Amino acid sequence: MENMYQYGTGRRKSSSARVFLKTGTGNITINNRKLNNYFSRRTARLIILQPIEFVNMSKKCDLYITVKGGGISGQVGAIRHGISRALIKYDSSFRNELRKLGFITRDSRQVERKKVGFRKARKRPQFSKR
């Protein structure tokens, strides 16, 4: 198991992330940039670290991540989903713990399409009685 990559794919909204996990010292690289440089928002970094810290692997593994599509929120969710899947491949005993927290479940919510005759997906034109 030493120096072997474990792979996980995560998706959220229109973002998709490929996560490669291997034993190491806790380095996280996203699109060839450090975690702190890629996501300046503290909440985004905390969401990404949730599954790793929950299973006490934050200083035991290195992560190499490529993510594309979407915005900050979608990319963060996709990365968290991918990390969770990679951790399960690394050690299947993490499955039940991560399942209880909802990290394994793919968030299937998507942007609703705009309808013809409406201003947005659900916003209708102003109604006039007379």
From Swiss-Prot:
InterPro entries recorded: Ribosomal_Su5_D2-typ_SF, Ribosomal_uS9, Ribosomal_uS9_bac/plastid, Ribosomal_uS9_CS, Ribsml_uS5_D2-typ_fold_subgr
SUPFAM superfamilies: Ribosomal protein S5 domain 2-like (SSF54211)
GO molecular-function terms, A-Z: RNA binding; structural constituent of ribosome
GO biological process assignments: translation
Pfam family, one: Ribosomal_S9
Domain of life: Bacteria
Keywords, ordered alphabetically: Ribonucleoprotein, Ribosomal protein
GO CC terms in record: cytosolic small ribosomal subunit
Keyword Ribonucleoprotein: yes
Family, per entry: Belongs to the universal ribosomal protein uS9 family.
Protein name (record): Small ribosomal subunit protein uS9
